[in-house]
């Protein structure tokens, strides 16, 4: 699926390993945690519909979100998980990250899931603000979560209203 926005940014889902190197390069620029190529392949090969990309008019990858569906440890219900989100610094503050997250949330909700989770560094104010503006809630502090020793917040988005 390909969607054009203002003829400048094109959104599409993952369709081929030909773009994997570009995804890895973009994610490695922004995220502090290193991932092996096997981690990327695990996500994109199992859930290609949950890997959304944004390209500029020249075809350059400028944004990506990589997600999966897994089981909640306590309830055994399926839930969405956002593993990676990155937008090229030159293209930030244009709504690209919001569009990528909202698109994936819509797909997860269509699959009947109750929630979507992710972790974000407590020092990553931009990410925390983005997710809060999209309706994610901080549900847990995870001390020393990252290899660098940085703490993280677990964030959750609930598709069904809390009662």
PLM-predicted stretches and their roles:
Residues 3-90, 101-111, 158-162:
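Acetyl-CoA-dependent GNAT
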Residues 39-45, 59, 116-123, 145-147:
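Short amphipathic alpha-helical segments embedded in low-complexity Lys/Glu-rich regions
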Residues 88-90, 94, 122-123:
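Active-site acidic-Proline motif in GNAT/NAT acetyltransferases
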Residues 94, 111-114:
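Short coil/turn segments at alpha/beta junctions that flank glycine-rich nucleotide-binding fingerprints
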Residues 97, 101, 124-127, 144-149:
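Short glycine/proline-centered loop/turn elements that form peptide/ligand docking sites
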Residues 117-120, 132-154:
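Conserved catalytic-core motifs of GNAT/GCN5-like acyltransferases
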């Amino acid at each position: 699926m390909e969607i054009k926005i203002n003829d400048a940014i094109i959104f599409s889902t993952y369709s081929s390993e030909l773009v994997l190197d570009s995804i890895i390069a973009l994610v490695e620029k922004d995220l502090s945690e290193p991932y092996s190529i096997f981690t990327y392949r695990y996500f994109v090969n199992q859930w290609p519909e949950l890997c959304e990309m944004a390209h500029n008019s020249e075809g350059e990858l400028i944004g990506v979100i990589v997600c999966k569906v897994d089981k909640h440890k306590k309830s055994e219900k399926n839930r969405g998980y956002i593993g990676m989100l990155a937008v090229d610094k030159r293209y930030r503050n244009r709504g690209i990250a919001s569009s990528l997250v909202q698109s994936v949330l819509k797909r997860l909700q269509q699959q009947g899931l109750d929630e979507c989770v992710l972790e974000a560094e407590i020092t990553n104010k931009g990410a925390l603000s983005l997710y809060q503006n999209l309706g994610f809630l901080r549900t847990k502090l995870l001390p020393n979560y990252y290899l660098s020793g940085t703490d993280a917040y677990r964030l959750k988005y609930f598709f069904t209203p809390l009662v």
